[in-house]
């Protein structure tokens, strides 16, 4: 807890640790229950920190701390720009370098430049009720998962809803508490489910419309 670990692709060797394991904090060497991270093509990384940290932390590709931003506000659900309540998802545009932050408990997405300057936001409203994570691939659309409806959702960068798929279930192909999702260079889509304790892999169907498929990732220098 409170740390990020980097392993070799086969998972056998730990090659880097960012943060101080088991020690919480809010600075360049400590996190407070971080949730997700995202990368720019040059390897610059952004950490959503997180359940208790309520901030975004920026690092270079070598793990050197650069800056952070965000605060909880008073009361905890204060919704002025830059105030957050459960930073639970983050995605970065590889072209504009804008940072999209899932302000989960405030039911909104806040958008910043890469150095934390507030740009704009959009509200999720009552539905979807519980956005858990964000992902942006090479197509530069935003994909999210809503635990309330067990659906994967697609948005443009202004927050316009475009498409969704998925249904609740513990059967193959159903979603039950998705808490992580990713895509590999072949277009295979992976979801990690906290409630079922499983990882599912979906292969792209030959001839499928790319608009309905979660985009392949942007290559990162953090490898």
Where are each of the predicted segments found?
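Eukaryotic scaffold repeat domains enriched in small/polar residues
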Residues: 1-223
């Amino acid at each position: 807890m409170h740390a990020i670990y980097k392993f070799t692709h086969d998972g056998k060797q730990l090659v880097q640790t960012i943060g101080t394991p088991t020690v919480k904090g809010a600075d360049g060497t400590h996190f407070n229950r971080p949730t997700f991270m995202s990368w720019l093509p040059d390897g610059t990384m952004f950490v959503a920190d997180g359940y208790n940290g309520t901030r975004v932390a920026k690092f270079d590709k070598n793990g050197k701390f650069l800056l952070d931003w965000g605060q909880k506000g008073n009361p905890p659900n204060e919704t002025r720009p830059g105030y957050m309540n459960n930073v639970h998802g983050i995605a970065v545009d590889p072209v504009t370098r804008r940072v999209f932050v899932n302000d989960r408990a405030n039911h909104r997405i806040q958008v910043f430049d890469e150095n934390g300057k507030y740009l704009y936001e959009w509200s999720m409203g009552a539905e979807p009720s519980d956005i858990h994570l964000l992902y942006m691939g090479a197509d530069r659309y935003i994909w999210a998962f809503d635990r309330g409806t067990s659906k994967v959702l697609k948005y443009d960068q202004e927050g316009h809803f475009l498409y969704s798929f998925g249904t609740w279930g513990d059967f193959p192909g159903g979603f039950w508490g998705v808490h992580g999702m990713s895509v590999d260079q072949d277009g295979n889509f992976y979801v990690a489910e906290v409630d079922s304790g499983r990882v599912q892999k979906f292969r792209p169907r030959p001839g499928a419309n790319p608009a309905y498929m979660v985009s392949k990732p942007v290559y990162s220098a953090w490898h």
